[in-house]
């Protein structure tokens, strides 16, 4: 107990009061306490001490030790067998009761205080009914304590053995009328029920008489006996039972009628008792019966709980709810309290309407039924109802799932387009994942639910399940998916310049041809002489005495830049296919043809390098016919123009053909609307931030427009054309560099101008979330291992990994490098790109590389200040490249370096056994070296008639009785082996040694 806390029982001991008296004072002062062991603050204790000085029944604190029995007053019922000795004790206070009859007459009806003194002892008898009396009378009590104190002091000496201190406190004036009725008949039965309190008087013989009327109502006796046994358990909570009626007191205080009636009835009864005390004992027995009946409901209520059938039912319920026993136990204890309150109400009504004993017995008969109904059963039933639906709901949910699984129809065919996990494959096949894993296990592949399966393995599993596997045709990325013109644009259409894309194989002269057209020297400034970006250029061409503009897009020809070529074909109006006359059709030429055909754009073939002596234009035309490109002179519809970019031959003819084709195509756009188009290229500039090259395909783009390109949102701050000049507006078919975006968009994304920034931001956030999910999926797939014989190594952690951080100049370069890296065999060494983005190499990239043991690759980009020093300090390797060939070669070499070198057998020479000599315990083979040489401690094989006889190590090699390190061809030598002695003439000896050899990446491994 802390210094500022006081316990109730310590306070009662200091005040020489009973615990119940202190609890009553606490209730009067509205101090919340639960029991005598509760703690209160010092301030509350001081309030209780002050109130205790005015508390009248406190003199009965001498009965404190008995009050503990009164707290066990419930156990007092076991004393019904011993009521007679206690009855004489209760007989003594009969004289006091006679005084009481006098006192009520003197103070009139309002002398509730005087009546309280006798009540203090007599109300103890109807303890069973105490709660009911306590509920209305306690409000009266605080007013009376002062006046009653003298009378109590007088009564205390008379009742030193009296035990019923709490009864005194709880007894109201209302109980006084019952008291006078009790003493003349010698209300020993009530003290017998409550255990003798401060009323000893009234002869013992009358007590059996009182019980005889109870015998008349067998229910009373039957119920009283069990009550005696049942009451001890609730005895402890009884102290707590008093508070609830007290809470109801304020409600009962409001109606004074019951109190006045009870007081008047008490007075009347008192008068009758005074007159009838000697004359009619029958009336006394009637009053006693009334008192007994009042207490009986409590006994009956408690006895109703005890029937065997109910106990058995409770036991069954407890067994069903074994897990919730602690909760139910507490509830069971509380419910009897509530029932007692209900019984008190019934008793109170019985006291107010004192009628025939038959009415009282009927009221006694009624409570047991509702009490039995209120017994622990409802609680248990309620809990079972609550718990039952839970378990039932779970069962139903499982059934529903099973039904859904059963009702889900299995498809007869499945479309597989790429790698996928076991879970995804199971969902597509409408099968449980366990079936997929089991099938793979039978095939010798141990897989988990998140294991990535390559297309071949997934197809094999699907076929094992009896399904047809369909592989969809890969849609060309060059196909035009969005129509830039809308219905409302049709009224304001105007002609626009054609967008021409130059495509072809690497080193066939695409950029040189464009330079010749533009009269610039772009090709000379390119690293390695190859184009690695898309360039957008504007050229003014004179045609029919008019200057017309043509927009040229130059695409890379290297195989790694497939996506760039496809992107160029998707946005173009006319494709110029450049083919070298001396080289013919090459792989990237074929790819460019497929892109142009997928985009459904007309193709103009420019046969370049006709100035070379080895040029064969006709052979080129013949090769192109295999791809449905038939020249016009051969009866086809494909325009083919032989040109020489170096000598500027036939360039005017080529431009004229381009303009003619553009006229046939009817190229129109609406410049009076907000701009729409495609991102050609994008990169992160160190000084200017994100920079995107945009091709406006419809509408007009102006400075200040709110632009959304993919998930990148921003406001156009500046636009720069291909010659480095700032422009304020970009009309259809115009390519410009745009500054002001918040992020680097992906090349190939479509852009659009919005009037409402909030709408644009919402769309940008949605697209960013989708990109984040796709990146997560790519990260998962980057860790995949093909389910081959090496999958075991992957699971055991033996699979080598090469971590890369890639930084390039533009988004298109990043895309091209990633695609090229994906073509490298990764069966034995897994290639993981941790981060790939356009921009310069920063210290953050170096820190990430140091944490993940990665190599930083920079392509056509620079190093930020401090990044090189940080890399040197942390030991991070930064590789810079400007040609994609070298980048890919070095990465392949690094991956091969991670492979464990393999041991390879290297042949040394051959020898033949010519003779066998016994030496000591063994034999020596005299041999002749036929080819190569024999080296001591090398590996040898002994072959006899082509069959292997022995394989081991050459332990001893001698030449003319001297040890030799090696013997070359054409010489004789002696060979001795420690573990082989079965030499025979004619045996062939093959000498070899095991050497380590660097492994190479094997795509079929």
Curated annotation (Swiss-Prot):
Protein localization: Cytoplasm
Record region (Disordered): 54-337, 368-414
Ranges for domain tr-type G: 495-668
Residue ranges, compositional bias (Pro residues): 75-86
One cellular component term from this protein's GO annotations in UniProt: cytosol
Role of this protein: One of the essential components for the initiation of protein synthesis. Protects formylmethionyl-tRNA from spontaneous hydrolysis and promotes its binding to the 30S ribosomal subunits. Also involved in the hydrolysis of GTP during the formation of the 70S ribosomal complex.
Any Pfam family matching the protein: IF-2
CDD domains: IF2_eIF5B, IF2_mtIF2_II, mtIF2_IVc
Region (G5): 644-646
Organism: Cyanothece sp. (strain PCC 7425 / ATCC 29141)
Ranges annotated as spanning the membrane: none
InterPro entries reported for this sequence: EF-G-like_DII (IPR053905), IF2_II (IPR044145), IF2_N (IPR006847), P-loop_NTPase (IPR027417), Small_GTP-bd (IPR005225), T_Tr_GTP-bd_dom (IPR000795), TF_IF2_bacterial-like (IPR000178), TIF_IF2 (IPR015760)
Keyword Endoplasmic reticulum assigned: no
Protein name, per record: Translation initiation factor IF-2
Binding positions for GTP per the UniProt entry: 504-511, 554-558, 608-611
Basic and acidic residues composition-biased segments: 258-274
UniProt keyword Plastid present: no
Domain of life of the organism encoding this protein: Bacteria
SUPFAM superfamilies found in the cross-reference section: Initiation factor IF2/eIF5b, domain 3, P-loop containing nucleoside triphosphate hydrolases, Translation proteins
Protein family (similarity comment): Belongs to the TRAFAC class translation factor GTPase superfamily. Classic translation factor GTPase family. IF-2 subfamily.
Region entry G4, spans: 608-611
Region (G3): 554-557
Gene Ontology MF, one: translation initiation factor activity
Biased composition (Basic residues): 392-401
Biased composition (Polar residues): 58-73, 146-157
Region (G2): 529-533
Keywords for the protein's UniProt record, in alphabetical order: Cytoplasm, GTP-binding, Initiation factor, Nucleotide-binding, Protein biosynthesis
């Amino acid at each position: 107990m802390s210094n500022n806390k006081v316990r109730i029982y310590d306070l009662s001991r200091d005040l020489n009061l009973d615990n119940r008296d202190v609890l009553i004072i606490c209730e009067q002062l509205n101090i919340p306490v639960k029991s005598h062991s509760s703690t209160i603050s010092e301030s509350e204790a001081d309030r209780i001490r002050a109130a205790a000085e005015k508390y009248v029944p406190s003199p009965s604190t001498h009965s404190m030790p008995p009050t503990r029995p009164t707290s066990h007053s419930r156990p007092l019922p076991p004393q019904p067998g011993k009521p007679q000795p206690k009855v004489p004790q209760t007989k003594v206070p009969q004289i006091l009761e006679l005084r009481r009859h006098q006192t009520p007459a003197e103070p009139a009806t309002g002398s509730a205080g005087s009546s309280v003194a006798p009540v203090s002892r007599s109300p103890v008898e109807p303890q069973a009914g105490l709660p009911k009396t306590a509920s209305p009378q306690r409000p009266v009590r605080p007013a009376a304590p002062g006046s009653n104190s003298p009378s109590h002091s007088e009564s205390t000496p008379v009742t030193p053995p009296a035990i019923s201190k709490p009864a005194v406190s709880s007894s109201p004036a209302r109980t006084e009328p019952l008291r006078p009725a009790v003493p003349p008949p010698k209300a020993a039965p009530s003290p017998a029920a409550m255990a003798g309190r401060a009323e000893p008087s009234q002869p013992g013989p009358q007590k059996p008489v009182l019980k005889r009327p109870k015998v008349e109502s067998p229910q009373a006796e039957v119920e009283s006996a069990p009550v005696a046994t049942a009451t001890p358990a609730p005895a402890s909570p009884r102290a707590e039972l008093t508070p609830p009626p007290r809470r109801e007191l304020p409600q009962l205080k409001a109606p004074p009628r019951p109190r006045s009636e009870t007081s008047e009835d008490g007075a009347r009864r008192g008068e009758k008792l005074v007159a009838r005390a000697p004359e009619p004992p029958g009336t006394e027995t009637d009053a006693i019966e009334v008192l007994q009946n009042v207490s009986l409901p409590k006994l009956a209520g408690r006895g109703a709980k005890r029937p065997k059938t109910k106990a058995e039912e409770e036991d069954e319920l407890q067994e069903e709810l074994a897990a919730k026993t602690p909760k139910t136990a507490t509830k069971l204890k509380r419910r009897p309290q509530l029932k007692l309150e209900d019984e008190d109400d019934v008793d109170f009504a019985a006291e107010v309407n004192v009628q025939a004993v038959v009415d009282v017995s009927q009221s006694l008969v009624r409570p047991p039924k509702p009490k039995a109904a209120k017994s622990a059963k409802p609680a248990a039933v309620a809990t079972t109802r609550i718990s039952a639906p839970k378990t039932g709901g779970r069962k139903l949910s499982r059934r529903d799932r099973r039904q859904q699984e059963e009702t889900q129809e299995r498809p007869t065919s499945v479309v597989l387009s790429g790698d996928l996990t076991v879970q995804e494959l199971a969902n597509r096949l409408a099968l449980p994942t366990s079936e997929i894993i089991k099938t793979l296990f039978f095939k010798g592949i141990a897989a988990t639910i998140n294991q990535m399966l390559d297309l071949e393995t997934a197809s094999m599993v699907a076929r094992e399940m009896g399904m047809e596997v369909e592989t969809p045709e890969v849609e060309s990325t060059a196909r035009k998916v969005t129509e830039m013109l809308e219905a409302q644009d049709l009224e304001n259409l105007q002609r626009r310049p054609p967008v021409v894309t130059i495509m072809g194989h690497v080193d066939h002269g695409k950029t040189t041809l464009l330079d010749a057209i533009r009269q610039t020297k772009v090709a000379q400034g390119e690293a390695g002489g190859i184009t690695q970006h898309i360039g957008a250029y504007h050229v003014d061409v004179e045609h029919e005495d008019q200057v017309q503009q043509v927009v040229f897009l130059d695409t890379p020809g290297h195989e790694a830049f497939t996506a760039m070529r496809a992107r160029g074909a998707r946005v173009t109006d006319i494709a110029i296919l450049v083919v070298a006359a001396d080289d013919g059709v090459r792989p990237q030429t074929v790819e460019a043809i497929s892109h142009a055909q997928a985009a459904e754009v007309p193709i103009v073939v420019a046969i370049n390098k006709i100035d070379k002596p080895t040029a064969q234009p006709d052979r080129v035309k013949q090769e192109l016919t295999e791809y449905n490109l038939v020249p016009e002179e051969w009866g086809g519809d494909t325009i083919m123009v032989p040109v020489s970019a170096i000598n500027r031959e036939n360039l005017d003819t080529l431009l004229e053909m381009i303009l003619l084709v553009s006229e046939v195509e009817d190229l129109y756009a609406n410049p009076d609307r907000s701009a729409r188009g495609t991102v050609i290229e994008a990169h992160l500039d160190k000084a200017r931030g994100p920079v995107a090259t945009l091709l406006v395909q419809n509408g007009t783009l102006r400075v200040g427009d709110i632009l959304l390109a993919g998930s990148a949102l921003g406001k156009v701050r500046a636009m720069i054309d291909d010659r480095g000049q700032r422009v304020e507006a970009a009309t259809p078919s115009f390519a410009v560099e745009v500054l002001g975006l918040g992020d680097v968009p992906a090349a190939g994304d479509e852009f659009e101008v919005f009037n409402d920034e909030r709408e644009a931001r919402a769309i940008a956030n949605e697209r960013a979330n989708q990109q984040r999910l796709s990146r997560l999926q790519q990260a998962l797939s980057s860790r995949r291992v093909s389910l081959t014989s090496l999958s075991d190594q992957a699971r055991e952690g033996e699979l080598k990994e090469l971590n890369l951080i890639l930084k390039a100049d533009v988004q298109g370069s990043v895309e091209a490098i990633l695609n090229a890296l994906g073509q490298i065999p990764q069966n034995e060494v897994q290639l993981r790109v941790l981060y790939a983005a356009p921009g310069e190499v920063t210290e953050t990239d170096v820190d990430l590389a140091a944490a993940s043991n990665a190599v930083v690759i920079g392509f056509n980009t620079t190093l930020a200040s401090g990044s090189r020093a940080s890399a040197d300090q942390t030991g991070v390797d930064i590789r810079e490249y400007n040609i994609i060939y070298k980048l890919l070669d070095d990465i392949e070499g690094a991956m091969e370096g991670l492979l464990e070198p393999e041991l390879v057998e290297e042949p040394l020479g051959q020898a033949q056994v010519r003779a066998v000599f016994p030496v000591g315990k063994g034999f020596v083979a005299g041999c002749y070296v036929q080819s190569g040489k024999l080296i001591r401690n090398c590996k040898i094989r002994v072959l006899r008639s082509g069959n292997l006889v022995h394989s081991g190590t050459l332990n001893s090699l001698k030449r003319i009785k001297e040890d030799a390190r090696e013997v070359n061809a054409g010489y004789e030598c002696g060979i001795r082996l420690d573990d082989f002695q079965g030499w025979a003439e004619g045996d062939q000896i093959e000498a070899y040694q095991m050497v380590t050899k660097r492994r190479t990446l094997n795509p079929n491994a």
